[in-house]
Amino acid sequence: MDDGYECPFEHLHDTEAGAKACKRVAVTREAETWLGTPYHHMGRVKGAGTDCLMMLAEVYEAAGIVPHIEVSFYPPDWHLHHDAERYLYGMMRYAREIPGPPELGDVALFKFGRCFAHGAIVIEWPSLIHAWHSAGVLYADAKQPQLAGRPVRFFDPFV
C-alpha cells in the first residue's frame, strides 16, 4: 500500500516490534479503504463487492503481509453443510493462532454453522472491520447479537 502514508513507528523500524507495529497500522488503514464495499460472494474488488474471506486476502496482500492467495470456489452456504474447517486451516497457513486478547490488525474467526466460517480484522477488540452478508464492509462490535456468544479464535498474521 503506497498512498504517501508515513508510519508513526518509522524510527523503530530497526526493531522487530517497530516494524510489526507499522504493518499492523498498514493493515487497518487498508481495511478502512474497503468500508462501504457491498457484499458479494467470492468478490474481491474494493468498492464493487467482496465477502469476508476475500476481503481478508486482499487487505493483507495490499498491506504486504501475504502473497496473492488463489481461492477455489466455495458455495455461499458451505459452512452449514460441512464439518471441514477450510477457513480455519487456510488461516493457519498464513497466521499463527494466539490465545488473545487480539491486537490491531489480527484476525478473528467466528464459528457459524458447523465450522469457523467468518473472518474479521481486529481494530481494538471487540471493534472489527468485516464484510457482512446483508451490509457489506463495515465497522462492527463483536458484542453485537450477530457475533456475541459465538466461538471465536484469534490469529496473528505478522509472524
Which stretches of residues belong to each language-model region?
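...with weaker cross-activation on analogous glycine-rich loops/strands in unrelated enzymes
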Residues: 21-28, 71-138, 142-143, 158-159
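Non-catalytic ligand/cofactor/substrate-binding and regulatory segments of enzyme domains
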Residues: 2, 7-12, 18-37, 143-159
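N-terminal non-globular leader segments, chiefly Sec-dependent signal peptides
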Residues: 47, 65-66, 70, 88, ...
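Surface-exposed patches in mature extracellular/periplasmic domains of secreted proteins
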Residues: 39-43, 67-72
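Generic structural signal for secondary-structure transition and capping sites
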Residues: 36-39, 96
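Active-site nucleophilic cysteine motif
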Residues: 44-63
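Residues in well-ordered beta-strands of folded domains
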Residues: 40, 129, 155
